[in-house]
């Protein structure tokens, strides 16, 4: 009996040992000793966060022995991963799937397809991303410009009834493939040629599949109020939630009137129209040089555009409109417009139009600068940076409770071209400059704008909060150190102060360095057919 008892005790000992080992490592990751800002806007609280199989499974206090990996977040903030709702990654993400500029800025999920430009075949796009794998989660809108160009090319006219039906069918297919909504870019070709009823028809289709309507509105300068009203009216007519992209005032005579433009949004919300806005925290925008020309000049394809831009009479007409717009903006020249990327001559990158004009030995006046712009557009155009906004408006818009933070950026190849710094530092800039330094926002409010508010707006389930059952998209940062380092003069610099970024429970950024891990997933819209 003693022998049997000894054997039994030995077995029980090893059974308990094995059980304790299993119990000891029941979590993949435990983040300890931090202050949790959960994304709701509520005050921070002290807690550990436990992660298992890509999900948050516990919020409380845990032993280090319970986890395979322990992250010490002492004196740091633990918050949900940032959701960037306005990006353009259609090309770049497949070339650089690690999306470094986003990860270093704390972004774990992105929405692409904005400003009316997306992949047409989203099922194929999503499949390709799943094959290459990415470091960020990705969702997409379906672009109005993409659909219109496919059906009508770049013609300057209304669609026929048949063409309208064709466009609506393409939007419907995209929604079934998982688009989160419809996006317009109403200053771009060919979307700028559309009238409101055309867009309403497409938005109604997106609404049928629980999508939203995101719009780069028709004018962000002298007619910005009318453009905001149009976006709101599309929401009203189509019964669809509205997202006004990169909300701004880029007309000098209207600087300081953001209280009025925000008021239009608030009035619509009081009416029962679901309107939100997003913003990048900079006083400069970035888009293509073609937007500096009247839209009619860019219709009907490259060959026709070339004829217009080399015809003396047509050039005169274009120049007259450009100078009229310049005067309306209370400007004497085009020195606000900087070249970010010009394939024809990269030595011009980083210089403004006035500087380039002088460099080429031309007369220093607005007329010759307008001619230079036409010449550059004729040679393929350039990506530009426009310094046209006021700090007062940026700060006021940022404080509006329904404003989200968005970069309006793509995947950036480090040290190539002279891009807008927003692609590197939008979130860190808000947390460093506007929360810590200027105290425009509470920390908890800023985090909400980057996390749960975007998730709610784009109907992204189980992300955007530190909550049990939610995806373990987590950012850990030092609120006293987080800062953007990218500037307009030196844009290629990653944000600092973010130590860890977890995407679906996997450390993609660890101790401030990208690990190369690609744990991102596809974010499908509610209309996705299984």
Regions of interest found by a model, annotated:
Residues 34, 49, 54, 75, ...:
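Divalent metal-coordination and catalytic microenvironments
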Residues 34, 395-402, 408, 475-521:
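C-terminal cap of metal-dependent C-N hydrolases
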Residues 36-48, 354, 381-394, 441-447, ...:
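Acidic, glycine-enriched loop/beta-strand segments at the rims
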Residues 26-31, 36-81, 484:
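Histidine-rich, glycine-flanked metal-binding segment
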Residues 73-78, 82-89, 94-184, 203-210, ...:
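Divalent-metal coordination cores built from histidine and acidic residues
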Residues 173, 179-231:
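Divalent metal-binding pocket/active-site signature
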């Amino acid at each position: 009996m003693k022998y049997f008892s000894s054997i039994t005790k030995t077995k029980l000992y090893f059974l308990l040992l094995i059980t304790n080992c299993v119990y000891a490592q029941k979590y993949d990751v435990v983040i300890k000793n931090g202050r949790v800002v959960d994304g709701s806007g509520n005050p921070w609280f002290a807690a550990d966060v436990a992660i298992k199989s890509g999900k948050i499974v516990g919020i409380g206090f845990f032993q280090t022995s319970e986890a395979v990996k322990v992250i010490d977040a002492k004196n740091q903030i633990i918050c949900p991963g940032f959701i960037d709702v306005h990006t353009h990654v259609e090309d770049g993400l497949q070339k650089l799937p690690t999306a470094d500029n986003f990860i270093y800025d704390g972004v774990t999920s992105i929405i692409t397809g904005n400003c009316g430009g997306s992949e047409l075949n989203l099922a194929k796009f999503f499949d390709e991303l799943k094959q290459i794998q990415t470091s960020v989660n990705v969702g997409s809108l379906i672009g109005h410009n993409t659909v219109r160009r496919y059906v009508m090319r770049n013609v300057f006219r209304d669609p026929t009834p048949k063409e309208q039906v064709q466009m609506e069918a393409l939007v419907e297919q995209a929604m079934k493939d998982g688009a989160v909504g419809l996006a317009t870019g109403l200053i771009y070709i060919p979307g700028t040629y559309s009238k409101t009823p055309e867009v309403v028809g497409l938005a109604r289709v997106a609404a049928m599949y629980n999508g939203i309507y995101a719009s780069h509105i028709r004018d962000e300068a002298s007619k910005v109020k009318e453009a905001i009203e149009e976006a709101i009216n599309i929401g009203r007519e189509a019964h669809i939630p509205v997202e006004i992209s990169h909300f701004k005032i880029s007309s000098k005579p209207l600087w300081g009137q953001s209280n009025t433009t925000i008021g239009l949004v608030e009035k619509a919300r009081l009416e029962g129209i679901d309107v939100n806005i997003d913003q990048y925290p900079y006083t400069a925008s970035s888009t293509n040089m073609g937007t500096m020309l009247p839209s009619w000049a860019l219709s009907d394809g490259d060959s026709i555009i070339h004829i217009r831009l080399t015809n003396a009479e047509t050039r005169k007409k274009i120049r007259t409109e450009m100078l009229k717009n310049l005067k309306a903006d209370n400007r004497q020249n085009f020195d606000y417009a900087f070249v970010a990327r010009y394939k024809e001559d990269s030595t011009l990158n980083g210089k403004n139009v006035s500087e380039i004009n002088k460099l080429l030995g031309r007369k220093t006046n607005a007329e010759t600068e307008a001619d230079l712009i036409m010449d550059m557009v004729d040679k393929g155009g350039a990506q530009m940076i426009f310094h046209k906004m006021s700090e007062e408006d940026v700060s006021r818009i940022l404080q509006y409770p329904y404003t989200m933070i968005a970069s309006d950026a793509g995947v950036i190849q480090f040290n190539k071209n002279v891009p807008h710094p927003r692609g590197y530092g939008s979130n860190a800039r808000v947390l460093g400059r506007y929360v810590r330094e200027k105290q425009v926002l509470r920390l908890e409010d800023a985090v909400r704008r980057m996390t749960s508010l975007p998730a709610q707006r784009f109907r992204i389930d189980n992300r955007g909060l530190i909550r049990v059952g939610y995806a373990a998209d987590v950012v850990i940062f030092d609120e006293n150190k987080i800062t953007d380092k990218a500037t307009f003069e030196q844009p290629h610099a990653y944000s600092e102060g973010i130590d860890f970024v977890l995407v679906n429970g996997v450390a993609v950024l660890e101790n401030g360095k990208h690990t190369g891990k690609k744990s991102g997933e596809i974010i499908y819209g509610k209309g996705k057919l299984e």
